[in-house]
A protein has these predicted regions:
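Switch II of P-loop NTPase G domains
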Residues: 1-39, 43-66, 119-131, 156-159
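Conserved beta-strand/loop subsegment of P-loop NTPase cores
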Residues: 6, 35-42, 58-84, 105-112, ...
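A short, ordered amphipathic alpha-helix with a cationic face
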Residues: 51-52, 73, 152-153
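C-terminal-of-GTPase-core extension/linker across diverse P-loop GTPases
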Residues: 83-175
Length: 175
């Protein structure tokens, strides 16, 4: 059987999506089903193409998306903590699970992505993977550049360089 990659184009996410703004809840439900996220980031200026925030700033745009994903993950963790805590009094494994869930939640509340959570071992990594957190998923950034920056792979584009630096610091790739 040949390998298949299916891309699902999901409408852009806006600030407040985790609270239902725009198509937020639908977007977050759709993205939860994917194995990896390809985040298209605007890295060009054109006065004919209006930016929702009024200016081009790819790091701000990445941060907006990441915060919405973090907020959604925190909500998922809060529900899981509430559900699991009920049985944790009589079950040491559930108590340990609650402890891990609370630690991940605290990590997210500091503005960190779940994938940067320091796992103790493979079992803990597998448990976190089973939570299907959005900020645990691998991310590839697609730098959307104008035609002038295609030949040099964006090397002369300062926006692309900022995205590359961010990606390198966050275990992600850019193309």
């Amino acid at each position: 059987t040949p390998a298949v990659i299916e891309f699902v184009d999901i409408a852009g996410l806006v600030k407040g999506a985790s609270k239902g703004e725009g198509l937020g809840n639908q977007f977050l439900a759709n993205i939860r089903e994917v194995d990896a996220i390809v985040h298209v980031v605007r890295c060009f200026e054109d006065p004919n193409v209006i930016h929702v925030d009024g200016s081009v700033d790819p790091l701000r745009d990445i941060e907006t998306i990441n915060l919405e994903l973090i907020f959604s993950d925190i909500e998922i963790l809060e529900r899981r903590i509430a559900k699991t805590s009920k049985g944790a009094f009589n079950d040491k494994s559930l108590a340990k699970e609650v402890e891990i869930l609370k630690a991940i939640k605290a990590h997210l509340e500091e503005g960190n992505l779940a994938k940067s959570f320091p796992c103790e071992d493979d079992d803990q990594r597998a448990f976190i993977n089973s939570l299907n957190l959005l900020t645990w998923k691998p991310v590839i950034f697609a730098a959307n550049v104008n035609e002038d920056h295609l030949e040099d792979d964006g090397a002369s584009n300062p926006y692309v360089q900022k995205v590359r630096e961010f990606a390198a610091a966050n275990d992600s790739q850019v193309f």
